[in-house]
Amino acid sequence: MSRISKAEMSKLLSVYFIMGSNNCTKDPLQVLREALEGFITIFQFREKGEGALTGEERICFAKELQAICKEYGVPFIVNDDVELALELDADGVHVGQDDEGITSVREKMGDKIVGVSTHTIEEARWVIENGADYLGVGPIFPTSTKKDTKAVQGTKGLAHFREQGITIPIVGIGGISIENTASVIEAGADGVSVISAISLAESAYESTKKLVEEVSRSL
């Protein structure tokens, strides 16, 4: 097995759905199924915050979601927990700046996908040099889903990464909706990551389809 290519990674980031049990008002397994039917390109399991599952319940839930992703041939990424990613044999892991260091993560994950949230050009250069496959850049817009976010960067912040010669695949993070997706892609992102735009939508399927259309139209 070898590391994922830049071109392949770029395609996978198109519509990146992030979800935990506490991000949904409907059955999360059904929400994920609808999102997959609508053609999300990658899924991240993020079980954090108020009301999140813990211990065995969390692991069992992750396995259920992973099995559904496998049915559809969509990569299953674990948020911030390298040990769980290894235990589940997940397709990859996504870490933040306050989590385990990129060098250690890459060593443990081998050739699997490693994504890193970055907020500055310096952080980006460091994680690229040490094995990141893609960057999560943001928050682009204000978000209520994540309580521990940094200052809003706007699409200008995202464009700045490209202007400074960062060529690695980038997914925009934070407050992204169907309405503002085009502006994120036009600023230089390869894709958009969303939580509530799909998890709280009246129809996760319809919302995903619209996001896919917006990304395709803007690339």
Curated annotation (Swiss-Prot):
Mg(2+) binds at residues 80, 99. This is Thiamine-phosphate synthase. Pfam families: TMP-TENI. It comes from Bacillus anthracis. GO terms for molecular function: magnesium ion binding; thiamine-phosphate diphosphorylase activity. 4-amino-2-methyl-5-(diphosphooxymethyl)pyrimidine binds at residues 44-48, 79, 117, 146. Binds 1 Mg(2+) ion per subunit. Belongs to the thiamine-phosphate synthase family. Its cofactor is Mg(2+).
